[in-house]
Amino acid sequence: MGRRTLSQRKGRGSIFKSRSHHKLGVAQHRAIDFFERHSTVRGLVKSIEHDPGRGAPLARVVFRNPRQYGLDKELFICAEGLYSGQYIYCGSKASLHIGNVLPIGQCPEGTVVCNVESKPGDRGIIARASGNYATVISHNADNETTRIRLPSGAKKTLKSNCRAMVGIIAGGGRTEKPILKAGVAYRMYKAKRTTWPRVRGVAMNPVDHPHGGGNHQHVGHPTTLKRSSPPGQKAGKVAARRTGLIRGGNKEGAADN
């Protein structure tokens, strides 16, 4: 009888919760209001800061409260080119400048935007990672929708009053920098709360994993498992529809022949 595998020791547990005690806060657009729907609201970028576990930098933006005396402090994801001391404008009448937030229906075709709302008022959920952006493709005035191209290349149709920030998310090319040493990877994954290092099953002893043991590193038996297998056996391809290389697909130039 072997030991319990790593996935068994983790247990079912609760829903994943991010370690938010060292994070700057929630980065999102202003809550939509009357002044942003019919005019513009001006904000000042106070500082640009690093958020642990996030690739893109964040900007602390201060707005003057249009309803009462006081200041509203917001946390925005930085667009590339945004700087400390810059004024940004949010609203339907905002101009097309880097960092401004306006409805995508007001953006000309071909405009590069980021932190796009999927539904009006959700404060931005599309194209938020470092270096990401979406492109405005076309507008439909009849049903008031706008079609955009997502970072994945897929196309999506949104309501034209969904807001977006003009520009590209800062921090592009972050993943191209080599890690070079294990200490950098250790701190990187610790900030993101990811298990690291991840040891392969074939590198373990047979007491630790179903794929362990042997005179050389090999599984030694089929890795496909049925869905009803007990937890100690579930290591490999669970209830796989198919395995192996996909053969017989369309090749380049096959359509021309």
Swiss-Prot record:
Component of the large ribosomal subunit. This is Large ribosomal subunit protein uL2. It holds the Pfam family Ribosomal_L2_C. Residues 207-257 are annotated as: Disordered. Gene3D superfamilies: 2.30.30.30, Nucleic acid-binding proteins, Ribosomal protein L2, domain 3. It is found in: Cytoplasm. The gene is RPL8. SMART domains: Ribosomal_L2, Ribosomal_L2_C. It comes from the Eukaryota. It comes from Entamoeba histolytica (strain ATCC 30459 / HM-1:IMSS / ABRM).
